Amino acid sequence: MATVTSAAVSIPSFTGLKAGSASNAKVSASAKVSASPLPRLSIKASMKDVGAAVVATAASAMIASNAMAIDVLLGADDGSLAFVPSEFSISPGEKIVFKNNAGFPHNIVFDEDSIPSGVDASKISMSEEDLLNAKGETFEVALSNKGEYSFYCSPHQGAGMVGKVTVN
């Protein structure tokens, strides 16, 4: 890469004739132009910036992976009344997203007799009167205590719409 640090410009002298004058007139001028140096960009500096961007991206991906969620469909694609998957395992604090897949009214109630001791089922469940009526509606919960949790859809529990999650 070429850089310009300074340049000198000389204007040649001019000898001109004036009417009625026999003496030589001399005009001489010189000017010095200096340009400020351009900032030097180096591969080393730009690689440093790229490296910082890569580290930031990797860190945000690791943070996001710790906050992963599992999706559980309420109603199978074939129309059956089921949680899909009906049994699964998660890590403590991992979010479960229950999503109405069919448009039938569903809810998620954790069975107070089939959850770890010390866990309040009412704090992790929907009320039995609340329903996810439309396709795409969701209910989210994060379970912190290790153990097995049984849950059901109250309108369809008799039809076998039950599930179990294990927090490892």
UniProtKB/Swiss-Prot annotation:
Membrane topology listed for this record: Peripheral membrane protein
Signal sequence, start to end: none
Cofactor binding remark: The crystal structure with reduced Cu(1+) has also been determined.
Pfam families reported for this sequence: Copper-bind
Cofactor: Cu(2+)
CDD domains xrefs: Plastocyanin
Location of the transit peptide in the chain: 1-69
Localization per Swiss-Prot or TrEMBL: Plastid, Chloroplast thylakoid membrane
NCBIfam families the record matches: cyanin_plasto
Family the entry assigns: Belongs to the plastocyanin family.
Protein name as annotated: Plastocyanin A, chloroplastic
Native organism: Populus nigra
